[in-house]
C-alpha cells in the first residue's frame, strides 16, 4: 500500500524536499524546519520527507524520535528513494498510527540525497521522481524554489523572493542561473505556488509567463520561545555570556551579505557610538557571498572595538539575543519575508527596518522605518529607538499584536490549502485562507 492508498477520509499524503536545508539553518531553512514541525502535528497529513545522507536524526524528531524507515530496497536504484513497501511501512511506524480521532501519521524519512549541491540537483531531477512514483504521494512540495522538471505528481513550490531575477548582482552567478531557471519552471509546471508575502506575490505576477494558483502564506512565530518574558530568571544572561555579548547593544541578525545592507549599519553605528559610549553593535550571523565590503568598512570604523561578531547563533540562543537587545536593526534592501524582524517585535524589542520593503508591509507601525541607503537616516533611527517615549510604547504594543497574528500552525494550514488545491480537491476541504489568484 502506498501513501496515496491510506484509508483515512480527509488525509492527504504530501512529499516535502528538505534536501536544501543546511546543517545550520537560517531563512528558508528555518521556514522549512518550522513548517514541517507544524505539519507533523496535524492529523490530516501523511508526510514523506526527503533529506540528505546523514541528516536523518534531525527529521526523526518530527515523529517523536522515530520516523518511518526510508532506506534501501528497490529504491536504491533510484538514488535510494526507497520502495513502496518502505513508504507504507512508515505510515504507521514508530511515532504514530493512523490519523483518526486526532492521532497522526508518522513522517516517512528518506535520507539518500547526495551531500554536494551539484549532484543533489541532479538527484532531484532523476532520483526524486522515481522515489515519488514508488512512495505514492498525492502532492510534492519544493519549499526552496525547485522541483523536478518531470514531476510524476502535482507539485507545490515556494518562492521566497525574486532577487535572483531582479537583482542578480546580490548573488553568486551560479545561484542566479539555477534559481532563475527554477522560478521559471515553477511558473510553468507547478500546480500551485506558495509566496511568503504579498510583496513577493506581486513581483512574481509581474515577471511574465504562465503561472499556477498563488497562495500567500506568511511565516509564523514560535510564541513559546519568542516572547518578552525570559523562560526563567537569568536564562538570557547565560546565553549572552556564552556568545560573548554585553548589554546594551544594537543587534543585526542574519546572513552577512550585500542585500542586508550591513555596511550601512556599520557606518550608522559609528555615528551614534560617539554619543553613546556604552552601546555596542552585535552582528549575529555567518558571512555570505560578497561579505568583503563589510570587513573593509569594519576595519575603518572609529569604534570597531565595540562591534561583536558572534558568527552563527544556535537556535536556542536566538530568543535571548533578540529579547535583550536595545534595538534590532534589519536594514535589508529587499527580503521575501524578514523573519528576524517579526521575531524581534514578538520579543517586544524596538525594531529599525527599511521603508518600502516587505518588513514595512509586515510590521507597519511596529517599526521605525528608514529609506534604504541613507546612513544618516539610519543613524537617526537608531537614536530614536533608544528613546522611551509614548511613541515607543505604541510601537511595542503594535509589534506584539502583529506577532500574535502569526503562528506556524496558521502557516501549516495555509500550505494544506495549497496541497489540497494541487491534488485537485475542490470540495471545500481547504479553507482558502491566504489564497490569491494571479492578478487578484
Describe every region a protein language model picked out.
Residues 1-75, 79-83, 90-440:
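Carbohydrate transferase catalytic cores enriched for Leloir-type hexosyltransferases
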Amino acid at each position: 500500500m502506498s501513501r496515496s492508498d491510506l484509508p483515512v477520509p480527509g488525509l492527504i499524503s504530501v512529499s516535502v524536499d528538505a534536501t536544501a536545508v543546511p546543517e545550520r539553518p537560517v531563512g528558508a531553512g528555518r521556514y522549512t524546519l518550522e513548517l514541517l514541525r507544524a505539519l507533523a502535528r496535524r492529523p490530516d497529513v501523511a508526510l514523506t520527507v526527503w533529506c540528505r545522507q546523514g541528516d536523518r536524526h534531525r527529521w526523526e524528531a518530527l515523529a517523536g524520535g522515530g520516523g518511518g524507515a526510508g532506506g534501501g530496497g528497490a529504491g536504491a536504484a533510484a538514488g535510494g528513494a526507497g520502495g513502496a513497501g518502505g513508504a507504507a511501512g512508515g505510515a504507521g511506524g514508530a511515532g504514530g498510527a493512523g490519523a483518526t480521532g486526532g492521532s497522526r501519521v508518522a513522517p516517512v524519512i528518506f535520507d539518500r540525497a547526495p551531500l554536494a549541491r551539484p549532484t543533489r540537483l541532479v538527484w532531484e531531477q532523476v532520483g526524486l521522481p522515481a522515489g515519488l512514483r514508488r512512495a505514492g504521494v498525492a502532492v510534492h512540495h519544493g519549499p526552496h524554489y525547485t522541483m523536478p522538471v518531470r514531476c510524476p505528481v502535482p507539485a507545490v513550490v515556494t518562492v521566497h523572493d525574486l532577487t535572483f531575477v531582479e537583482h542578480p548582482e546580490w548573488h553568486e552567478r551560479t545561484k542566479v542561473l539555477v534559481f532563475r531557471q527554477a522560478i521559471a519552471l515553477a511558473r510553468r509546471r507547478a500546480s500551485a505556488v506558495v509566496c511568503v508575502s504579498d510583496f513577493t506575490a506581486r513581483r512574481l505576477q509581474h515577471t511574465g509567463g504562465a503561472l499556477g494558483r498563488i497562495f500567500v502564506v506568511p511565516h509564523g512565530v514560535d510564541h513559546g520561545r519568542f516572547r518578552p518574558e525570559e523562560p526563567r530568571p537569568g536564562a538570557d544572561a547565560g546565553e549572552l555570556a556564552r556568545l560573548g555579548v554585553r548589554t546594551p547593544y544594537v543587534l543585526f541578525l542574519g546572513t552577512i551579505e550585500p542585500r542586508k545592507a550591513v555596511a550601512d549599519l556599520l557606518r550608522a553605528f559609528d555615528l551614534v557610538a560617539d554619543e553613546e559610549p556604552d552601546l555596542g553593535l552585535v552582528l549575529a550571523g555567518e558571512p555570505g557571498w560578497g561579505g568583503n565590503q563589510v570587513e573593509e568598512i569594519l576595519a575603518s570604523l572609529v569604534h570597531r572595538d565595540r562591534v561583536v561578531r558572534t558568527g552563527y547563533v544556535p537556535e536556542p540562543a536566538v530568543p535571548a539575543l533578540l529579547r535583550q537587545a536595545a534595538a534590532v536593526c534589519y536594514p535589508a534592501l529587499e527580503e521575501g519575508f524578514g523573519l528576524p524582524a517579526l521575531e524581534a517585535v514578538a520579543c517586544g524589542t524596538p525594531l529599525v527596518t527599511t521603508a518600502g520593503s516587505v518588513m514595512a508591509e509586515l510590521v507597519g507601525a511596529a517599526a521605525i522605518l528608514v529609506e534604504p541607503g541613507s546612513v544618516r537616516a539610519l543613524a537617526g533611527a537608531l537614536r530614536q529607538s533608544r528613546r522611551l517615549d509614548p511613541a515607543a510604547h505604541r510601537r511595542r504594543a503594535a509589534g506584539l499584536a502583529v506577532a500574535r497574528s502569526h503562528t506556524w500552525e496558521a502557516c501549516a494550514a495555509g500550505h494544506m490549502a495549497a496541497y489540497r488545491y494541487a491534488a485537485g480537491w475542490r470540495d471545500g476541504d481547504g479553507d482558502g485562507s491566504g489564497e490569491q489568484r494571479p492578478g487578484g
